């Protein structure tokens, strides 16, 4: 977790409980469950809460197809999986001609190759397949190297004035990789901003 994310949470009054980076998001989930058991509380279950899929089915997907009905391919990074699965369910439910491609770090290609590893793309690649995710639902799984995504953050800002985060830049790279094989518009989901990651980007 970047220093900026930690500060933002602390500013909101949150008590930060940090887990070893080597444990990945699985370690954070286990710690959250332990806190609920020992101290009481509510476990939102980001990786297994069907409300995430429902939200993207009811809001994100309709917005996409209202604004860009010509879209033929959508690239979404998979953290909890709610975005990609929610959009795909909407496409199927409405019989739309559009493919959904999941994106994961090349250093941790768990969905595509079955192996997990450390990587630089915060927000995706939890090093376990979330309960919300059915990998067979996707039309393809793309991978992007962390170093390439970090570089792309700067390139997007300098070229287009887009100040996005690392997973957003990775989605753009994934979308570019589809250009030769896609006849129509390609949309990349950009879910985060660069101001959450300066310490991770400029070291």
What are these regions (language model features)?
Residues 8, 33-37, 129-136:
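Short, conserved catalytic or adaptor-binding loops enriched in Gly and charged residues
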Residues 1-35:
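A glycine-rich helix N-cap at a beta->alpha junction
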Residues 44, 160-169:
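Short glycine/threonine-rich catalytic loop with a Thr-x-Gly-x-Asp
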Residues 26, 48-143, 148-149, 177-203:
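Glycine-rich phosphate/pyrophosphate-binding loop at beta-loop-alpha junctions
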Residues 16-18, 43-47:
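Short beta-strands and strand-loop turn motifs
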Residues 14, 39-41, 98, 184:
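A structural micro-motif
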Residues 72-73, 157-163:
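A short glycine/serine-rich beta->alpha loop
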């Amino acid at each position: 977790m970047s220093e900026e994310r930690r500060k933002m949470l602390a500013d909101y009054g949150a008590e930060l409980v940090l887990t070893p980076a080597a444990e990945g998001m699985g370690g954070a989930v286990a710690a959250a469950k332990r806190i609920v058991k020992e101290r009481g509380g509510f476990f939102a279950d980001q990786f297994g809460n069907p409300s995430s899929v429902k939200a993207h089915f009811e809001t994100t997907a309709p917005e996409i197809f209202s604004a860009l009905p010509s879209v033929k391919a959508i690239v979404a990074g998979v953290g909890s999986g709610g975005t990609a699965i929610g959009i795909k369910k909407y496409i199927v439910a409405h019989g739309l001609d559009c493919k959904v491609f999941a994106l994961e770090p090349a250093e941790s290609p768990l969905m595509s190759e079955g192996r997990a590893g450390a990587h630089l793309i915060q927000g995706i690649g939890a090093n376990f397949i979330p309960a919300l995710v059915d990998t067979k639902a996707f039309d393809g799984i793309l991978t992007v190297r962390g170093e390439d995504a970090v570089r792309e953050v700067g390139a997007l800002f300098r070229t287009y004035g887009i100040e996005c985060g690392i997973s957003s830049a990775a989605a753009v790279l994934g979308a570019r990789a589809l250009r030769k094989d896609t006849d129509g518009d390609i949309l990349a989901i950009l879910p985060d901003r660069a101001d959450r990651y300066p310490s991770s980007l400029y070291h």
